Amino acid sequence: MRDPDPIFTGLGEQEAWGVEDPRLSKLDDTFYMLYTAFGGRSWDDHRIAMASSQDLRTWKRHGIVLDESNKDAALLETKINGKYMLFHRRLPHIWCAFSDNLKEWHDHQIIMETIPNGWEENKIGLAGQPIATHQGYLMLYHAVDDQKTYRLGAALIDGENPTKVVRRLPQPILGPELAWEKAGHVPNVVFSCGQVIKDDFLYVYYGGADRVIGVAGIEMDKIIF
């Protein structure tokens, strides 16, 4: 059943044009939502903001996480050496940072870069919080080429040191093929902010052409790096 009312809406000047692209992570009994707060004063006026909840309906706002033009953020669901790990996107690459308190972030570093002359040459960004597997962390991400086509890729990051990419698949796992993925508000886009594993099956929920929501899936044991 679809709730007729939104669970979260924009407040204040920084969210005047919307709250977008939420990515959820659960640490202990708390859900943390990292989202894009779009102020609309320019096309670069987007900031990473955070809210938390125990029931996914009542949210506590924690404000701006990084006061810079940034987006595509999520928390790893496991602390690394006692610290929270944040994934984010300073154009055009995927970055990470660490924190003791979810407020001050340090040790910013690039995890994964774009690759010239191909489907991920323009920019890349996290598609949802990395998922723990027996191989390491499965990280899905979106990639944009010079024609502004959005596809999804997959990479394996080290289970002990998640700043290290073990391998990334050379070809996209999903791209715009269907009519509603090719034509819409923004054409030629598949864009995911979250995935679910149920009964060893990975469900990837994604936006098609910035207009509709779709889902694709694969058995976990078929994902081989």
Segments predicted by a language model, with ranges:
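Beta-rich carbohydrate-recognition and catalytic domains
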Residues: 1-17, 25-122, 131-188, 199-202, ...
